[in-house]
């Protein structure tokens, strides 16, 4: 018997494109390749709408012309890391550009001064790498940090790394993908964006952030109080994001996907059946990819139950 069920793994390349989003990927890639820099783009959409898949396809489509760096906040979202998340992100950025420990130390001090907090991370297993050591080094109370000076040095060192990396790799620009910001607590997502603001004015850099406007406004209220106006949340978002891109879920071309899934789960599709099934999905759960996968998985389970073909499971489990 062949395997059943559909996994929720994101797509990695346009060869796997299920919903005919190639025009959007191509358009965004062209914009990223030719836009003025620095530039920050947000990929917005509900959970399961395909933000990570879209970013993966953009990355795969641009490997010949840009130097990509990927930071996935989901890997850290389940840990209460304090400022450790920011240091981990900086660690990924600096190492992605070929930076050494002394550069990372300078950056870490700048981040520490900027946030004006003491970072405490319980174990190297969470952060790992040189970032963990940097956290311990720069959070000792024996050294006063000149915030303005450290931030200036941070920007200068980061820009130098960008320039050297592009010259070495013969690429046009560095594209930094920050995924799954909406999986963080909103206030933590805002803190991470505040750290990113330190780097957003670096030439030849494009930042692509998977973050929703609603997450930012909620985070602003959580961090600074409910008295913060909605307009201030909008201003914060607009100051960071120059190009907001909403995942076009309503315009996904899902007819072929629905037909393929119907065949996979044993439903014969004839005549206009596929159009009918597609319309039913659109008017019930919509075209959110994660929701559709759950629908097909649920159908297959119920089909097994109704046919009495569920695997025999010991009663004592």
Model region roles, listed by residue range:
Residues 216-239:
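Short regulatory helix/loop adjacent to the ATP-binding pocket of P-loop NTPases
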Residues 267-317:
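C-terminal helical "lid" subdomain and adjoining coupling/linker elements of P-loop NTPases
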Residues 55-167, 171:
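P-loop NTPase nucleotide-binding core
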Residues 239-275, 285:
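Conserved small helical "lid"/interfacial subdomain of P-loop NTPases
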Residues 57, 85-89, 191-193, 222-228, ...:
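Short secondary-structure boundary/capping segments
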Residues 146-214, 218, 223:
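Conserved Walker B catalytic segment
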Residues 1-79, 84-87, 157, 161, ...:
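Walker A/P-loop-proximal flanking segment of P-loop NTPase domains
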Residues 47-49, 75-78, 212-217, 249-254, ...:
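Conserved nucleotide-binding/hydrolysis micro-motifs of P-loop NTPases
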């Amino acid at each position: 018997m062949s395997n059943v069920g559909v996994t929720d793994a994101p797509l990695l390349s346009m060869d796997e494109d299920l919903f005919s989003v190639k025009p959007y990927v191509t358009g965004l890639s062209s914009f990223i390749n030719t836009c003025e820099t620095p530039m920050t783009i947000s990929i917005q959409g509900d959970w399961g709408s395909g933000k990570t898949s879209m970013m993966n396809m953009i990355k795969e489509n641009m490997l010949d012309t840009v130097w990509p760096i990927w930071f996935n906040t989901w890997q850290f979202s389940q840990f209460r890391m304090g400022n450790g998340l920011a240091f981990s992100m900086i660690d990924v950025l600096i190492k992605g550009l070929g930076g050494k420990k002394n550069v990372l130390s300078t950056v870490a001090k700048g981040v520490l001064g900027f946030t004006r907090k003491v970072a405490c991370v319980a174990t190297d297993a969470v952060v790992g790498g040189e970032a963990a050591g940097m956290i311990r080094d720069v959070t000792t109370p024996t050294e006063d940090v000149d915030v303005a000076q450290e931030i200036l040095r941070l920007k200068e060192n980061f820009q130098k790394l960008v320039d050297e990396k592009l010259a070495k790799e013969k690429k046009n620009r560095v594209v930094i993908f920050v995924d799954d910001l909406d999986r963080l607590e909103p206030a933590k997502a805002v803190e991470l964006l505040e750290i990113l603001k330190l780097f957003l004015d670096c030439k030849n850099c494009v930042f692509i952030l998977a973050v929703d406007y609603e997450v930012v406004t909620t985070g602003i209220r959580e961090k600074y109080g409910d008295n913060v106006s909605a307009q201030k949340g909008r201003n914060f978002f607009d100051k960071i994001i120059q190009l907001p891109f909403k995942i076009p879920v309503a315009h996904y071309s899902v007819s072929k996907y629905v037909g393929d899934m119907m065949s996979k789960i044993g439903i014969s599709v004839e005549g206009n059946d596929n159009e009918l099934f597609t319309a039913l999905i659109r008017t019930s759960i919509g075209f959110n990819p994660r929701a559709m996968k759950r629908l097909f998985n649920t159908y297959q389970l119920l089909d097994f139950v109704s046919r009495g073909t569920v695997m025999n499971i010991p009663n004592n489990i």
